[in-house]
């Protein structure tokens, strides 16, 4: 896609404020990068697509002991993506939101994201509350 510095700035800002191990960057040639990663064998490539195998069947086989690249499919995903991916996984076989597919996949693969320890190091901490907003601001040291 096209480079959008504002998207990267937003994601990096959210990570800085709320914590957690998240990184992002613009890749000018994503298919070349995916090919290199596929050939290296050092990462697992997971392609989320409505044409893949059911997520409940695929997830137990996806290794957790090496980095993963999750490609969220859409109408413009090159056909080659299906061939270089280690797993083509569907969250449903009907059109659906790519963000929803990613959320379902990540929750099932890495587990619940609502544990406070998953997002340490942030300036802001949201405390679960049945009513209203409870936020703790951590002062920088």
Regions found by a protein language model. Give the residues of each.
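Compositionally biased, intrinsically disordered low-complexity regions
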Residues: 54, 123-124, 134
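Basic, gly/Ser/Thr/Pro-rich low-complexity segments located predominantly at protein N termini
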Residues: 78-79, 137
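Short internal beta-strands
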Residues: 1-3
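General N-terminal targeting signals
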Residues: 62-64, 88, 106-107, 141
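Structured adenosyl-cofactor binding patch, chiefly the S-adenosyl-L-methionine
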Residues: 81-120, 124-130
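S-adenosyl-L-methionine/SAH cofactor-binding core of RNA-modifying enzymes
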Residues: 8-77
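General "foldedness" signal
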Residues: 36-38, 59-62, 102, 119, ...
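Long, charged alpha-helical interface segments
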Residues: 130-141
């Amino acid at each position: 896609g096209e480079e959008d510095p504002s998207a990267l700035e937003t994601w990096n800002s959210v990570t800085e404020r709320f914590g957690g191990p998240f990184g992002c960057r613009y890749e000018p040639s994503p298919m070349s990068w995916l090919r290199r990663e596929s050939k290296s064998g050092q990462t697992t490539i997971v392609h989320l697509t409505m044409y893949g195998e059911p997520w409940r069947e695929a997830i137990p086989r996806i290794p957790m002991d090496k980095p993963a690249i999750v490609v969220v499919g859409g109408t413009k995903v090159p056909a080659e993506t299906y061939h270089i991916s280690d797993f083509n996984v569907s969250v449903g076989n009907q059109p659906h939101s790519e963000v929803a597919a990613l959320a379902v996949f990540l929750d099932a693969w890495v587990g619940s994201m609502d544990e406070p320890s998953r997002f340490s190091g942030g300036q802001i901490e949201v405390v679960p509350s049945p009513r209203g907003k409870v936020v703790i601001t951590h002062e920088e040291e």
